[in-house]
Amino acid sequence: MKEQITICGAGLVGSLLAVYLIERGFSVRVFEKRKDPRKNEADAGRSINLAISHRGIHALKDAQTGLEKEALKLAVPMYGRAIHDLHGHVSFQAYGEASQHINSIGRGALNKLLITTAENLGVHFLFEHTCTDYHAAGEQWLFSDITGNTVATQSKEIVIGADGAFSIVRSFLSKQQQPQPQIETLEYGYKELEIASAHTETITNNQALHIWPRERFMLIALPNEDGSYTATLFLPLKGEISFEALQSDQDIQLFFKKYFPDTENLFPDLTEQFYRHPTSKLFTIHSSNWFNAHTLLIGDAAHALVPFYGQGMNAGFEDCRILAEIIDGKSKTNWSEIFAEFYNQRKENADAISDLALQNFIEMRDHVADASFLLRKKIEKHLHQELEDAFIPQYTMVSFTDISYKEAMETGLLHQKILDEIMAIPDIEAAWPTEELKNKVITVTKKYI
């Protein structure tokens, strides 16, 4: 008889995990509090498009042959950042080599694909079922539907919480374990705005992440498959320039005219959208308790992070791949060992990408239009071209390889030290890129690697 596993959450991570587990011979059922998203639109306030890069694609490919190809049919490639200055001038910054790109993909479309894929393999989905209780003594979970009918798991059945940043499974586990999860809230919020395809004629590069960096805040826009864009305004919640300060039609219109003048034609219904779309908060979840003997947290339920590196979904998908690899490496399914090994592998990497995401917010918001920053990027590119694998830029490690997040973070700190020394070379900003300087930066770098 097949061992049954229950997953709480049919979002992106939960539905992909279901594919991995049923492919390994388990009987899998998934409880989800929402209605079936194949019959309903995406939840208001949730990001409706995301960035999928190498780690996420690798996880899709390993889950089922060809799944990554089906997903990428729904995606738009983004080869770099299109930076919009205060005067409406646009400059392009490539993410890496000419062929390297991340992909903008609709959350809803990808979620539907993954649910259908899992369902076709035999996964049983129970929508409109909420996790309502946990009986610690018998290690039994209860799920209730909208009519009040209750479904109980078997005693000590394996339950995996993939129910996101506001995880109910995590909240029940935290009542049994110490220390409590810590929520690190940013002073920023975000609001999504839609740019209809009919209003995009002024956007000249439709294969880029568009950024309007304004130091303390920024606007970004990701392309969608239908030619539209999803824009997101990141702004302090309170203060002189903040969501709190934008209270009237005039406030909103003057703010966009002053700071994002080239977006005037993109949002003909700006104020209506601004009021209609919710302002959401940004936060990071720090938890050291991801599991007990028969329960595991995965994805955002274990390690929610801010969206500024585009790695939330990728990290969650990588969780699924790593968990499956650990299961495959065991001759006998000892869940306590599997969960402990998963935690030991993923916790330090989750902490690393959480820190990197916060750092990337500062980079996107403050530095992408700075001349010194741009020179550092040019020198970084030169070092990678000359030294190849001996000097891989941090962004490349995170977005285009399977190098662990922890290693990427630690190597990035070393690179920062190298580049600080290089930038201290007299007159480098004025003289770059002479052959003498190109050779000198190689010499400096080789002292460290």
Curated annotation (Swiss-Prot):
<dbReference type="GO" id="GO:0009435">
    <property type="term" value="P:NAD biosynthetic process"/>
</dbReference>
<dbReference type="InterPro" id="IPR027545">
    <property type="entry name" value="Kynurenine_monooxygenase"/>
</dbReference>
<comment type="pathway">
    <text>Cofactor biosynthesis; NAD(+) biosynthesis; quinolinate from L-kynurenine: step 1/3.</text>
</comment>
<dbReference type="InterPro" id="IPR036188">
    <property type="entry name" value="FAD/NAD-bd_sf"/>
</dbReference>
<keyword id="KW-0662">Pyridine nucleotide biosynthesis</keyword>
<dbReference type="InterPro" id="IPR002938">
    <property type="entry name" value="FAD-bd"/>
</dbReference>
<dbReference type="GO" id="GO:0004502">
    <property type="term" value="F:kynurenine 3-monooxygenase activity"/>
</dbReference>
<keyword id="KW-0503">Monooxygenase</keyword>
<dbReference type="GO" id="GO:0070189">
    <property type="term" value="P:kynurenine metabolic process"/>
</dbReference>
<dbReference type="Pfam" id="PF01494">
    <property type="entry name" value="FAD_binding_3"/>
</dbReference>
<keyword id="KW-0285">Flavoprotein</keyword>
<dbReference type="GO" id="GO:0019805">
    <property type="term" value="P:quinolinate biosynthetic process"/>
</dbReference>
<keyword id="KW-0274">FAD</keyword>
<dbReference type="GO" id="GO:0043420">
    <property type="term" value="P:anthranilate metabolic process"/>
</dbReference>
<keyword id="KW-0521">NADP</keyword>
<dbReference type="GO" id="GO:0071949">
    <property type="term" value="F:FAD binding"/>
</dbReference>
<keyword id="KW-0560">Oxidoreductase</keyword>
<comment type="similarity">
    <text>Belongs to the aromatic-ring hydroxylase family. KMO subfamily.</text>
</comment>
<protein>
    <recommendedName>
        <fullName>Kynurenine 3-monooxygenase</fullName>
        <ecNumber>1.14.13.9</ecNumber>
    </recommendedName>
</protein>
<dbReference type="GO" id="GO:0006569">
    <property type="term" value="P:L-tryptophan catabolic process"/>
</dbReference>
<comment type="function">
    <text>Catalyzes the hydroxylation of L-kynurenine (L-Kyn) to form 3-hydroxy-L-kynurenine (L-3OHKyn). Required for synthesis of quinolinic acid.</text>
</comment>
